[in-house]
Structure formats: C-alpha cells, structure tokens
Amino acid sequence: MLIPSNRTKRECILSRLCFLVLSVWVSLPSAAQNNPYKIDDALYPIYQRASKQARQQEGLLVADTLYQQALKLGDKKAQCLAYIIPLQFYISQKDDSKIEKASTDLKEISRANNYLQYYYHAWSSEIIYFLNQQRSLLALQKAE
C-alpha cells in the first residue's frame, strides 16, 4: 500500500485550494462594462435613447440627463458622449452659432477628461458641416 508523503499531501491540498479560489473568482459578477463604448452599464441605455433622439429637441434633455448621471457616477467618457448629442442636434438644425458653441463645449470637456478622440470628433464634425454647406473657405479656416 502506498502511503502519501507530506509533500504530496501539501501539493494536493494546495491544488484543491487553488481550484476552489479560481472557481469562486470566475463565478463572481464582472464589474466591466458590457457595451461598445465601455461606459457604465447604467448609462448606456440613456446614451442610446439620447443618440436616437439626437435630431430632436428631446434629445437635448436626454443628453443633459446622461451628463448629470455620468457626473454622479464619475464616468468621464459618458460625460463626453453626452456633449456629442447637442452638436449633432445643432448640425441637423443648421444653426452655425450653436454648432460652434456645442463644438467648443465638447472640445473643452474632452480635453479636461482626457478623451481626445471626442475633441477631434467635434473638430471634424464642424469642418464636414461647413464643407457640406459649400463653405469651403470657412472649413479650411477651421482646419488650420
């Protein structure tokens, strides 16, 4: 009859303990975001609603709600996404002064929150808007 050594017993106990810890860790709910924008999952449905209504006045209200909730949760990326909605709305309304203000606001928050992709989104959206309006000179000035 084989009598296990102390070393073998320790290895067996250690492997069972590792298996137990790993099993518990895998079964814990993940805190990661499960949406394409990697924002807080509680904010994603609000963003979707705001995005769907971006060409309507109601979209501005939903975007404001998104921003306020993102502030409470400390989600800086969602704060930037909330500022995209007004820019989209004013572009659809062809309101030059409000487009410029919405673009400036988005640029400021994106720089403050260190999400520069949204800075460039604001910048390129403005340029594309002016190009589509046959105002190439203004678009070139914005590009400089």
What label would you give each PLM region?
Residues 1-46:
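Bacterial Sec-dependent N-terminal signal peptides
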